[in-house]
């Protein structure tokens, strides 16, 4: 019965692991709801900012902010958002693949690539790959704040202001629903013009800037970039919790199936051992 004992020990080990994955699934489900609330609370602000900036980019302003000017893309920057922890399926690798594919397209055009990374997974992945990382931030936790991101965003904005970058993108996982997380690349700079039909129809008016366009736009456009990066971070956080919940549920279900299989093997081994003992008893009695 040595084999049966080993199987019984393995069943106990799998059951212990199953308890852990079930607990992690429940924790992730709870955190996902909170993350979704935070994401949905900030999404209207980010979307409204995008509409306002889209209108500003289409306007004929007396003051043309540098962020509105198109220039030849010789240096391209990416702010890549990832998680600090694993056990969330292919969430990180999917967004990394999306970013790497886009980077390769720019490299083929002769552009240099520079990164700012959010989350320890992106830091490890791109540093291991030899990428040029200008800024990094990790340890944001389950309640990231805009203040945590200003430093890294500021580094990339300064490089853009000084002509060290000609394009700036943010890469993150967009939360579609619990089952779908979509790797997304959004252009931050130069400011993307709105190409929606609604905006084109309504573009017969313009904003009045008080007191002057320059100081207002200098502040507004920086806030716009910060808000889009922050939205990417909270979207990615909701995706992380959803992906972890799904991964842990799959692990729990797999553990259940494995336990069933092991119990079947155990019962067969036990039955074989009993049959062998009975055969030995019958054989011994016949010999007598």
Swiss-Prot record:
Single GO molecular function: proton-transporting ATP synthase activity, rotational mechanism
Entry's Gene Ontology BP terms: proton motive force-driven plasma membrane ATP synthesis
Subcellular location: Cell inner membrane
Pfam families in the cross-refs: ATP-synt
Topology term for the membrane: Peripheral membrane protein
Keyword Transport tagged: yes
Keywords for this protein: ATP synthesis, Cell inner membrane, Cell membrane, CF(1), Hydrogen ion transport, Ion transport, Membrane, Transport
InterPro entries found in the cross-reference section: ATP_synth_F1_ATPase_gsu (IPR035968), ATP_synth_F1_gsu (IPR000131), ATP_synth_F1_gsu_CS (IPR023632)
Record flagged with keyword Membrane: yes
Chief subcellular location: membrane
Any one annotated GO CC term: proton-transporting ATP synthase complex
Function field: Produces ATP from ADP in the presence of a proton gradient across the membrane. The gamma chain is believed to be important in regulating ATPase activity and the flow of protons through the CF(0) complex.
Assembly and binders: F-type ATPases have 2 components, CF(1) - the catalytic core - and CF(0) - the membrane proton channel. CF(1) has five subunits: alpha(3), beta(3), gamma(1), delta(1), epsilon(1). CF(0) has three main subunits: a, b and c.
Family: Belongs to the ATPase gamma chain family.
Name used for this protein in its record: ATP synthase gamma chain
Source organism (scientific name): Vibrio alginolyticus
């Amino acid at each position: 019965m040595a084999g049966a004992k080993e199987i019984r020990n393995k069943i106990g080990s799998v059951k212990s692991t199953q308890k852990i994955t079930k607990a992690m699934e429940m924790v992730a489900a709870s955190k996902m709801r909170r993350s979704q609330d935070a994401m949905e609370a900030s999404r209207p602000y980010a979307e409204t900012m995008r509409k306002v900036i889209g209108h500003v980019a289409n306007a004929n302003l007396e003051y043309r902010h540098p962020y509105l000017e198109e220039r030849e893309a010789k240096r391209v920057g990416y702010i890549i958002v990832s998680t600090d922890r694993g056990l969330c399926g292919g969430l990180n690798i999917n967004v990394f693949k999306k970013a790497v594919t886009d980077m390769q397209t720019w490299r083929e055009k002769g552009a240099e690539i520079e990164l700012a990374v959010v989350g320890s997974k992106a830091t490890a992945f791109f540093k291991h790959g030899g990428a040029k990382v200008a800024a990094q931030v990790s340890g944001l936790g389950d309640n990231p704040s805009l203040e945590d991101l200003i430093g890294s965003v500021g580094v990339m904005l300064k490089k853009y202001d000084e002509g060290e970058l000609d394009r700036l993108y943010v890469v993150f996982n967009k939360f579609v629903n619990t089952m779908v997380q979509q790797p997304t690349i959004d252009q931050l700079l130069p400011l993307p013009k709105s190409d929606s039909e609604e905006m084109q129809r309504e573009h017969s008016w313009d904003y009045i800037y008080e007191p002057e366009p320059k100081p207002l736009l200098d502040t507004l456009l920086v806030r716009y970039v910060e808000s889009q990066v922050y939205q990417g971070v909270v979207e990615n956080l909701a995706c992380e919790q959803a992906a972890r919940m799904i991964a842990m549920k799959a692990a729990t279900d797999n553990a259940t199936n494995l336990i069933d299989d092991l119990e079947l093997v155990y019962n067969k081994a036990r039955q074989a051992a009993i049959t062998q003992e009975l055969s030995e008893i019958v054989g011994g009695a016949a010999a007598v």
